[in-house]
Every structure is written in C-alpha cells, then in structure tokens.
Amino acid sequence: MAAKIIDGKTIAQQVRSEVAQKVQARIAAGLRAPGLAVVLVGSNPASQIYVASKRKACEEVGFVSRSYDLPETTSEAELLELIDTLNADNTIDGILVQLPLPAGIDNVKVLERIHPDKDVDGFHPYNVGRLCQRAPRLRPCTPRGIVTLLERYNIDTFGLNAVVIGASNIVGRPMSMELLLAGCTTTVTHRFTKNLRHHVENADLLIVAVGKPGFIPGDWIKEGAIVIDVGINRLENGKVVGDVVFEDAAKRASYITPVPGGVGPMTVATLIENTLQACVEYHDPQGE
C-alpha cells in the first residue's frame, strides 16, 4: 500500500483564502479588518522565522498586523504592561506572544495575562478548560489544524484507536482532547511510556510530536493507519525531516503528512482562523 499524502500546504492555502474572502466581505459591509498583535522578545533566530511567517500570513488575508519586537532585556513587568495595553485596544482581536521567552520571564504568568477572548494561540487555561469540557472557544492551533486536515480529507475518526506520542501543553495534551471530541479512543504516550512500539502498532491514527528525527520506525506503523507527523527537525546536512521515518511509514500507512508541507502550514492557517473568530464572535458589536 502506498499512502495518500495529506497536503497541508494546499489545505492551509484554502483556509487562508476563505479567511481573506470573509475579511473582504467584512470591509465591504463597513466593518473593520481583524487585528493581530505579534510580540517577540529577544532575537531567537527560529522565533524570528516563525514570527515573520505569521505576520506575512496576516497581511495576505487583509488583517491589521501589529509588531512588537522587544529587546532581550525586557522585564516581565514591561511585557505584562504591554499585554494589558493590547487587551484594552479595541482594534486588536488577537495577541500572540512568541515562545520561548527569555530566562526570568514566567511563561505561565504571561499567557494567563492575555484576555481569553484574544488568546488566539489557545493556550490560556480558560480556553484549554473549555476544550476539555467539550465547549471549545479559541483552540490551540496545531491540534485544531490537524483536525481540519482530517476533516478536509473526509477521514472518519469516530471509533478509531488514536495514539498521541508526546504530551506537551502545545500539542500532545490539547490534541488528546481534540481527538476525544472527534470520537477517538485516545492514548497519550510520553517519555516514561513502557513498550511504545505496542501502542504504535495498535494505532489506527498516530500523531507524533516529540521533536526527534526518525523517532518512529516505519515498520512499527499498522497497515492502513493514518500518520500525522508534527515534528520539524533540521539535520546537520540542512535537510528538514519529521519524527517518523517517512519513506518506510508511507509503505504501510493509508494517509501520511509529509515534513515539510504537512502540519506546519496548518498551524499558521489556524492562527489566522482563530483571529477572525475572535473578531467576529467576541469583539464585533453583534457578538457581544
């Protein structure tokens, strides 16, 4: 069996085009364009690349994009003060603080300071709690983007045995809740899991998010499984690969996401969707 490739790049472009059309319709109706504030503290090169892609996506769909590039020496108090200002700004629908933050700044305190209705990353405990209680509002971008991919490929997830490898706050944990909502029987594995291979071999739907190149061998994959590879790992030779050995896994899976061009583009597309949702549902006058 040769797996069908889940083309995240194409689906992400579709999502962005849909958002752009809705923004044009808003402006034609006399409503304002959604606004996203992107805050970067310090000069982490990887963060700069991520932030640039988010700002570019904003401008492409017609959002107002506001950039705040703060020096590495910024204090926690100064960052919290900026968030307070953005929370009170009626032209800003989403606030994104790029992680990781420099040493000395408490990530949790910063994320909790963002108003839940402007938390377009979906990391605020309120939004995570809403997802947990089956009443989601703004949802974490990567897990939601993965669900969108499955939906757009008409993959029926109800009753599937889903296995998530990696239990991070950004992907693994919220992913498990999205999969429960999607009707899966969900197992979350992590660094202390015994006999990982056994779990992988029984997975109808496998989501791998550990950040280790080639962590899952292709011969572990169940015949006909759906494989979603969240890993983005740059090798010494410059090649970008996922957490799954793609060539071998693709021989056994029914569907598989490539790296790059699979999950990555969906994260930014979902951020854009979340910002429009925040604008329409929580900040428009009729949304009150």
Curated annotation (Swiss-Prot):
Catalyses: (6R)-5,10-methylene-5,6,7,8-tetrahydrofolate + NADP(+) = (6R)-5,10-methenyltetrahydrofolate + NADPH; (6R)-5,10-methenyltetrahydrofolate + H2O = (6R)-10-formyltetrahydrofolate + H(+)
Q: Which residues form a coiled coil?
A: none
Q: Which residues bind NADP(+)?
A: G166, A167, S168, I232
The record's section on CDD domains has: NAD_bind_m-THF_DH_Cyclohyd
Record-listed E.C. numbers? 1.5.1.5, 3.5.4.9
Q: Does the keyword Oxidoreductase apply?
A: yes
One cellular-component annotation, GO = cytosol
Tell me a Gene Ontology molecular-function term this record carries.
methenyltetrahydrofolate cyclohydrolase activity
- InterPro entries on file: Aminoacid_DH-like_N_sf, NAD(P)-bd_dom_sf, THF_DH/CycHdrlase, THF_DH/CycHdrlase_cat_dom, THF_DH/CycHdrlase_CS, THF_DH/CycHdrlase_NAD-bd_dom
Q: What PROSITE patterns does the record point to?
A: THF_DHG_CYH_1, THF_DHG_CYH_2
Pathway involvement? One-carbon metabolism; tetrahydrofolate interconversion
Which SUPFAM superfamilies does the UniProt entry name for this protein? Aminoacid dehydrogenase-like, N-terminal domain, NAD(P)-binding Rossmann-fold domains
Q: Which GO terms describe its biological process?
A: L-histidine biosynthetic process; methionine biosynthetic process; purine nucleotide biosynthetic process; tetrahydrofolate interconversion
Return the Pfam families for the record. Answer: THF_DHG_CYH (PF00763), THF_DHG_CYH_C (PF02882)
How it assembles, according to the record, is: Homodimer.
State the family named in the UniProt similarity comment for this chain.
Belongs to the tetrahydrofolate dehydrogenase/cyclohydrolase family.
Q: What does this protein do?
A: Catalyzes the oxidation of 5,10-methylenetetrahydrofolate to 5,10-methenyltetrahydrofolate and then the hydrolysis of 5,10-methenyltetrahydrofolate to 10-formyltetrahydrofolate.
Would you tell me the protein name for this molecule? Bifunctional protein FolD
Q: Which organism is it from?
A: Escherichia coli (strain SMS-3-5 / SECEC)
Name of the encoding gene: folD
